[in-house]
Amino acid sequence: GYNSLHKKATDVFRLLRVQRRVFRERGRELNREEYQRLLESARSQGRERLALLMEAVCSTGIRVSEVRCLTVEAALRGRAEVSLKGKIRTVLLPAKLCRKLLKYAKTQKTASGEIFLTKSGKGLSRGQIWREMKDLCQAAGVERSKVFPHNLRHLFARAFYRASRDIVKLADVLGHSSIDTTRIYLMTTGEEHARQLERLGLVT
């Protein structure tokens, strides 16, 4: 009857389910060279705030919503306290980033509190950061589909993992409660995987 047919169809579907996606679409992955071009474009246009903000996100792995935690006090301490869903995690800030943050804050006459502010003294919104980054695409020669704040976090994750090979530590740094989430951040287009296969030299 209908029920047995439905069960067979479900079983077939279960057998045919495609393995979890392992590689990322080429049009979505931002690489280090493209990131550098975005920074250069921002600086050549005199957009120092945007260039520094991108460096801050990409060198720490913070979420764009956590940029408000980058305060003068955090830069002086070398770490920021980030609160999310009742949990607080400590984000270490590279010494070079701290120096740049403090120098920028000084030029903006910001003695304390948030460093990245609008001209009216308000914190930058996610939408504003997104739009400002998109504005760099043409000059930087980077596809628009690759340029959005969260992709800087993905670039940080891949760089951190290549250096440490410690996915548990990376999950802590990113503030992930599940390593499965962290695995998504480490997906690449597959080009690196292909190079590794070639280096194995197992085809004579």
Residue ranges of model-derived segments:
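Flexible interdomain linker/hinge and immediately adjacent N-terminus
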Residues: 2-37, 84-86, 119-122
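Conserved tyrosine-mediated DNA breakage-rejoining catalytic core shared by Y-recombinases
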Residues: 34, 60, 65-103
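C-terminal catalytic core of Y-nucleophile DNA break-rejoin enzymes
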Residues: 85-103, 113-134
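DNA/chromatin major-groove-contacting recognition/catalytic segments
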Residues: 188-204
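Short, polar N-cap/turn motifs at the start of nucleic acid-interacting alpha helices
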Residues: 75-77, 146, 166-186, 191
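Short, leucine-enriched amphipathic alpha-helices that occur as contiguous helical runs
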Residues: 35, 49-51, 126, 130, ...
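Basic, Lys/Arg- and aromatic-enriched nucleic-acid-binding interface segment
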Residues: 30-64
